[in-house]
Every structure is written in structure tokens, then in C-alpha cells.
Amino acid sequence: MEGFNIGGKSLKSRLLVGTGKFASYDLMKQAIEGCGTQVVTMALRRVNLDHKEDNILEYIPKDTILLPNTSGARNAEEAIRIARLSRAMGCGDWVKIEVISDQKYLLPDNEETVKATEVLAKEGFIVLPYMNPDLMIAKRLESVGAAAVMPLGSPIGTNKGLQTKEMIRILIEEIKVPIIVDAGIGKPSQAAEAMEMGAEAVLVNTAIATAQNPVKMAKAFELAVRAGRLAFNGVTAPQAKVARASSPLTGFLHEGEA
């Protein structure tokens, strides 16, 4: 499968994996290694440099790109502060912007997300903003320096799939930076659907971490993402209004009847 580019970094795996909700760090590590992801996202509060056994970084493969998120930020100012702290702690320049002031549905605040993205992009961060799919917001994020745009498929942790499919389709058509579908993808088939639409990648956490067998589920998502991308490149066949037989319905059975 061909690669894609984020912030000057070439990636082969189109599956990004979140690290929350796993029963243990060991299980998380097995899932990450088993699916071959190159980018993992994590909350900064789980980085504990003073206690090695409690430090999530000890369980993430060293060749994996860290994508710290600004989970807990309620406005742009808090997101910016978390991103700067992450860099100071040695977690790199990549950051996933999450600005959520709504505590019921956990929907991102698009306006505050744009503000944070603009500031951090100017400071040299590779910014991947999580956002409610809206074309004008996506264009603004692109214009202020977002390295990719991460529209939600459905609310975080719901596993409801691509409820915003048509809005995401518009972003795929109109936005030049990579579109990475994030949040709500609950099944490998839903990940494949996102890839068939033309998304560059998907980010999955809850559906893997809370599965009965997270390691197998992570592998299933890897294969689904690969299949979806292959289908996109192959260009799926158009729908027909009426039935069309794949083999002739007449011919040799009636030869010689005339």
C-alpha cells in the first residue's frame, strides 16, 4: 500500500491508534505492535517521567511517532499550554488539538480549535486538529497551518460509525491536507468505508481497546484500512438502477431451437 505524508513525514500505515481505555499497558503495547501503526495518540497526563512502570512512553515502540493530544483543554489557551508542555517534556512536535467545552457530547469547539492551531503552527508544531466536519472551518484550519484535519465520524467513544459521512466526503473533495477520520469508528467495516471514500487515514481507539480481544481487533482494523484504500485506488463500480447479469441469460441453452 502506498504511503502518505503528514508534515513532511512519509507514513506507510494509514491506521493511527489511540492509547486510552486499554485494560493494561502490556495489552496496549501488543495491539500497537500487532497492527503496525506508526502513529499513536496519548493524553499528556499519562506521561510519568518519575515512575517508569507508570509511564506510558515505556510501552510505546521507540520507532513510533508520538501524537500527544490536548485532552482536557476547554479553550485555545489551555490547548496551547498543554502542547508547549508536551514539547518541553520531550514528546516531540506533533500534537493533536482537542478543545472540548461540551461535557455531555464531547463535541469539539471549532472556533477555539482554529485559534490554537494558528498559534502552534507558527511555533513549529505539526498540528492535527480534531474538529466537527465543517467545510469553512476545515479551510481555515488548512490556511493557518494544520498538517492534517481530523473530522469526527460520530461522537467520541460511541462506536456509531460514519454518521457525518456526507460532510466528510465534502472535506475529502475540497481540502488539500490529509483528512484523517477520528472518533466514533466502531467496526473494521466502518474504517474500510472511510478509506473507500478517500480519507487518507483513520484513528481508532475505543473500538480496539474495549474489544474482547484488542490485539485481534487491532489487526482486523489494519486489514480493513488496507482493503479500503485498495478499493479506493481500484475505483469501485458504479451503482445500476436495474439488475445486470454477470453472465449471459440466453445463448447455448436455446441453440438450434429456431
UniProtKB/Swiss-Prot annotation:
Residues at the catalytic site: 96
Subcellular location field: Cytoplasm
Cellular component terms per the entry's GO annotation: cytoplasm
CDD domains: ThiG
Binding site for 1-deoxy-D-xylulose 5-phosphate: 157, 183-184, 205-206
Pfam families cross-referenced by the UniProt entry: ThiG
UniProt pathway annotation: Cofactor biosynthesis; thiamine diphosphate biosynthesis
E.C. designation(s): 2.8.1.10
Primary subcellular site in the record, as a coarse category: cytoplasm
UniProt enzyme class: transferase
Protein family membership: Belongs to the ThiG family.
Assembly and oligomerization: Homotetramer. Forms heterodimers with either ThiH or ThiS.
PANTHER family assigned: THIAZOLE SYNTHASE (PTHR34266:SF2)
Annotated function: Catalyzes the rearrangement of 1-deoxy-D-xylulose 5-phosphate (DXP) to produce the thiazole phosphate moiety of thiamine. Sulfur is provided by the thiocarboxylate moiety of the carrier protein ThiS. In vitro, sulfur can be provided by H(2)S.
Protein name, per record: Thiazole synthase
Gene field: thiG
